[in-house]
Amino acid sequence: MKATMVLTPLALAMAAVLSVSAYAGNEGGWHPPKPNPQSNNKGGATALVVDTQQNYNNKVSNFGTLNNASVSGSIKDASGNVGVNVAAGDNNQQANAAALASADASFVFGTATASTSVLQSGYGNTLNNYSNPNTASLSNSANNVSGNLGVNVAAGNFNQQKNDLAAAVSNGQYSTAGSAASQTSTGNTTVNSANYAYGGTYVSLKLNADGSYKGTSDQIGDVYLDTWEGQTHPGGSNTGHIDVDSQAQGAKDLNHDGGAFAFKEKGDVDLKGTVSGFIPAIVGFKTPVTNNASLSNSLQNVSGNVGVNIAAGGGNQQSNSLSIAAGCSSCPAGGESLGF
């Protein structure tokens, strides 16, 4: 299984739009937390990101499966909010979320609040890898980027990755920023083993067998041989017959079945043969399970908030969270705006 990403300028623009999973406001049916009625603040701005990733009771068996996830030559000279997720394997969870809030000049006594909360839990998962290489790489990418950048690259199984940003700005004198992350991983089972490498070999067999046989031949019943005058049968007239039963002179009935002819025999049996063919055989072991995660020639000349997660293997949990709150006691009319 292979996942590769090369972003075009159009894809960059779409990623910048689609990666915003929560926006502080009243549109779309989402409502931010209500202000405290006991507070003396007349207004404010709130940005909140709450994320939960759960991965449990799954079972995956890989036999020689190749999982390669890579980002190469992409996300260059981008600005704004950019989120990229690349995964290869099974049951991987990735997300990039941003929440932005800005209060105008009328909320001069308000408070700017930004917070992120991330919960990742993985339990009861079973992973069996047999000669299964996992490779995750970020190469020559995300250079000269400014703004908020989140990149997740995972190869394998049951990996959880998060990049979250919450930012709020207000003309109020107070600002609050909070960030919380919880990751739990219990009751998981991972088995990494090398798989057999099967082949075949040509075989040639020769067979030589010796044996012997011993037995007795006996006449059963009375037999009478006819005699004729002519040279051919039935040429001429019948002159009589010859008795070969037990009543003949000197005859003996060997097996007491009425016959007088008995022969003892003895012989040898000689068996020879050649067998050849092709049979399967175990000729060794394939390459054992290998997990490679690499970052090369990337993230150069970057400014702003950058979160990058690269994971190879199984059951990895990664999170990058940032909360920014800006308040101002002497801002000009119109307030400030965030540069994202």
UniProtKB/Swiss-Prot annotation:
Quick one: where's region Linker 1? 101-133
Q: Which GO terms describe its cellular component?
A: extracellular region; pilus
Q: Where is this motif: Cys-X-X-Cys?
A: 328-331
Which compartments does it reside in?
Fimbrium; Secreted
Instruction: Give the signal peptide, or none.
Output: 1-24
What residue spans do the FapC_R repeats cover?
67-100, 134-167, 291-324
Instruction: Name its GO BP terms in alphabetical order.
Output: amyloid fibril formation; cell adhesion
Q: Which parts of the sequence are annotated with region: Linker 2?
A: 168-290
Keyword Magnesium present in the record's keywords: the answer is: no
Which keywords does this Swiss-Prot/TrEMBL entry list? Amyloid, Cell adhesion, Fimbrium, Repeat, Secreted, Signal
Mutant lacking the gene: phenotype: Deletion of the entire fapA-fapF six-gene locus shows no visible growth phenotype.
Subunit structure and binding partners:
The major component of purified amyloid fibrils. Fibrils are resistant to boiling in 2% (weight/vol) SDS and require >90% (vol/vol) formic acid to dissolve. Interacts with FapA in vitro.
Protein family per UniProt:
Belongs to the FapB/FapC family.
Specify the protein name: Functional amyloid subunit FapC
Origin species: Pseudomonas aeruginosa (strain ATCC 15692 / DSM 22644 / CIP 104116 / JCM 14847 / LMG 12228 / 1C / PRS 101 / PAO1)
Q: Which gene encodes it?
A: fapC
